[in-house]
Amino acid sequence: MSIILGIDPGSRITGYGVIRIVAGKAEYLGSGCIRTDFGELPSRLKQVYDGVSEIITQFKPDEFAIERVFMARNADSALKLGQARGSAIVAAVNALLPVSEYSATQIKQAVVGTGGAAKEQVQHMVTHLLKLSATPQADAADALGVAICHFHTRQSLIKMAGRATSSVRGRYR
């Protein structure tokens, strides 16, 4: 059994999603958003750090996954997003969690089956995959998608490692 914390970073709203892996299946533990005030950026970054640290204390995850920064049209927005992302990563590293990073395309591919999926499609599939009674808000759904992507990626790597050990001279046994 392991617990995965997924983060969808933002300088105003940072989504989080927590899943537990039991017998090869993902179970929903919690999700939500860390909303920062409209203060100066350093204050908002501290709020992201403190919020992620609090979630780590509450859920005690074993693994941490976060969305990579994409190139935004607005360079200032991309820089702020990167700084918020860094605040979340520092919280994970301080808690001695392994950190994995995924692009938006990888996350959408893992959750919906296509890298070009819309936010609504991600919300729908997260709701379906985790058997939720209500659709989570967009940022929380994206964070749950990050956690699901990490779970699927980890499962694929485990399967590939198993195949590699059963291979002799290029043949599978």
Curated annotation (Swiss-Prot):
Protein's organism: Aeromonas salmonicida (strain A449)
GO biological process per UniProt: DNA recombination; DNA repair
Record protein name field: Crossover junction endodeoxyribonuclease RuvC
Entry annotation: catalytic residues: D8, E67, D139
Quaternary structure and interacting proteins, as annotated: Homodimer which binds Holliday junction (HJ) DNA. The HJ becomes 2-fold symmetrical on binding to RuvC with unstacked arms; it has a different conformation from HJ DNA in complex with RuvA. In the full resolvosome a probable DNA-RuvA(4)-RuvB(12)-RuvC(2) complex forms which resolves the HJ.
InterPro entries xrefs: RNaseH-like_sf (IPR012337), RNaseH_sf (IPR036397), X-over_junc_endoDNase_Mg_BS (IPR020563), X-over_junc_endoDNase_RuvC (IPR002176)
Cofactor(s) annotated in UniProt: Mg(2+)
Family, similarity comment: Belongs to the RuvC family.
Coiled coil: none
